[in-house]
């Protein structure tokens, strides 16, 4: 089992990153790949997901993120893609609060989460996340700023691709696109966070 990979970011796409270590490039799916900058040195905490038709590495900037991901995978109806979309929201405190308060209306805002799955998340995880992630705080996923060198148009397009990769529909993306265009030049990561804030309202 690979606990983490420490190396250099070789490639960043809307769905995954490639981190090079010892001449080997590891393809790792992450909640928001654009928080990483090419050629930066990173430590990625990994989860090896193996099923009959799938063999993939999922990676996170902190062990807490990884633990939340594994908890989400234990919920019936939540797969890796759904768990990544929830983690990409950038506000784990709000997610945990929604689970503890049985706020189904908040949970169904995530792509792929309907009322039945939201209820299952609450049934399976209520009262259990605090023990799994004792140090969790509302800004857990607000990672250290990584400077982005992108023109605004390119960053916005990458952000829209990232939203599609997370499972948001073109209709949902078109709703937030005008708001994003009004923003001053942002990095791809910042555009994604702004979009998720709008989508989860």
UniProtKB/Swiss-Prot annotation:
**Residue segments, region Domain I:** 1-61
Checking SMART domains in the record gives: HhH1 (SM00278)
Q: Which residues cross the membrane?
A: none
* GO BP: any one term: DNA repair
A cellular component term from Gene Ontology for this protein is: Holliday junction resolvase complex
Give the region (Flexible linker) as residue ranges.
141-151
- The protein's role, per its UniProt record: The RuvA-RuvB-RuvC complex processes Holliday junction (HJ) DNA during genetic recombination and DNA repair, while the RuvA-RuvB complex plays an important role in the rescue of blocked DNA replication forks via replication fork reversal (RFR). RuvA specifically binds to HJ cruciform DNA, conferring on it an open structure. The RuvB hexamer acts as an ATP-dependent pump, pulling dsDNA into and through the RuvAB complex. HJ branch migration allows RuvC to scan DNA until it finds its consensus sequence, where it cleaves and resolves the cruciform DNA.
Q: What is known of its domains?
A: Has three domains with a flexible linker between the domains II and III and assumes an 'L' shape. Domain III is highly mobile and contacts RuvB.
What protein is this chain from?
Holliday junction branch migration complex subunit RuvA
At the highest ranks, the source species' classification is:
Bacteria, Bacillati, Bacillota, Bacilli, Bacillales
